[in-house]
Amino acid sequence: MSKPRTRVAVIFGGRSNEHSVSCVSAGSVLRNLDPERYEVVPIGITTEGSWVLGSTDPETLSIRGRALPSVDADGSALALTADPTRSGDLVALDDGEAGKILASVDVVFPVLHGAYGEDGTIQGLLELAGVPYVGPGVLASAAGMDKEFTKKLLAAEGLPIGFQVVLRPGTATLTDEQKSRLHLPVFVKPARGGSSIGITRVAEWAALDDAIAHARLHDPKVIVESGIIGREVECGVLEFPDGDVRASVIAEIRMPEGAGDDEAFYDFDSKYLDDVCEFDVPAKLDESVSDEIRELAVRAFSALDCQGLARVDFFVTEDGPVINEINTMPGFTSISMYPRMWGAVGVDYGTLVSTLVDTALARGIGLR
């Protein structure tokens, strides 16, 4: 008798400004979950926050030209019950079916990027519901989403970070003293965002206030970081079902000559639409530098109390590696660096997502 398949809910979309990136990531996950091992239940979250039963066809979640996918409200409306005695039950909400159990899932893969998904919110719901899930828990997800607290935790562990100033709601701009501690260029960012959305490179102070206003379109709390001169690299961290935590090879992102001017950086269009960046996987670094980055990545993973996976971004400077940020649910598109880094060491995409699901099931539920 064949072993029953594990029922995996893949959740995507969401209310954040990274809605479309989440959809594309989920399409790649759907494409690579082994149908002999897993029965997939796709759940889309609209930009308004409604949960609907999605399509199992990954092509519906693909980028077409420069058109990005999104979740519409046409599917059957549903909700995940937060009652742990009904762990994993997905309940219909539509008239005539309200209360009917549409499916009961064994584990959730929350392929959500940004606010209301990657920031500890859905992780809290899944903890209440008593459902195992892929990725870090509530604390690590919340801290990893907020660049202020990411760096506070990293600094507390003695890990190398750059200088930043936090502008909370009600604080309009930098003081002269803060400007003197920063050095141009600076990067102005939403404190709780990803995919390089809302980020501006500021080369002169006259442009600062416009950059802050732009970032505040996405988050009332803003980070201003000193620009760091160095090579931009990334390292993936993966937890296995036995609890072993490993780091991937290092990848380097390069803006090729002719792709832009001195102000070019790895922004949203560069990542997902324009195909102008060049990547070295593995990066062409001295072995000792690569080993140091891998060690720092695992230490950063531990500093935030992550589980499952994370991608740690660095600058390699003349004085050594500096951690830029941690992404607790990195992109899973076909061109995303996290699966590419693991693919370079023989962990193909299908094996990667299976490992993540198996690790979530091994971890179980409750305090740990």
Swiss-Prot record:
Record SUPFAM superfamilies: Glutathione synthetase ATP-binding domain-like, PreATP-grasp domain
Top enzyme category: ligase
Start and end residues of each ATP-grasp domain: 151-358
Listed cofactors: Mg(2+); Mn(2+)
GO molecular function: ATP binding; D-alanine-D-alanine ligase activity; metal ion binding
TM annotation in the entry: none
Catalytic activity field: 2 D-alanine + ATP = D-alanyl-D-alanine + ADP + phosphate + H(+)
Keywords: ATP-binding, Cell shape, Cell wall biogenesis/degradation, Cytoplasm, Ligase, Magnesium, Manganese, Metal-binding, Nucleotide-binding, Peptidoglycan synthesis
Residues involved in Mg(2+) 2 binding: 325, 327
Residue sites binding Mg(2+) 1 per the record: 313, 325
Subcellular location: Cytoplasm
A single GO cellular-component term on record: cytosol
A Pfam family it matches: Dala_Dala_lig_N
BP terms from Gene Ontology: cell wall organization; peptidoglycan biosynthetic process; regulation of cell shape
Binding site for ATP: 179-234
Biochemical pathway: Cell wall biogenesis; peptidoglycan biosynthesis
Manner of cofactor binding, per the entry note: Binds 2 magnesium or manganese ions per subunit.
Record InterPro entries: ATP-grasp, ATP_grasp_subdomain_1, D-Ala_lig_Van_CS, D_ala_D_ala, Dala_Dala_lig_C, Dala_Dala_lig_N, PreATP-grasp_dom_sf
Ligase found in the keyword field: yes
Keyword Ligase tagged: yes
Function noted in UniProt: Cell wall formation.
HAMAP family on file: Dala_Dala_lig (MF_00047)
Listed name of the protein: D-alanine--D-alanine ligase
Species per Swiss-Prot/TrEMBL record: Rhodococcus jostii (strain RHA1)
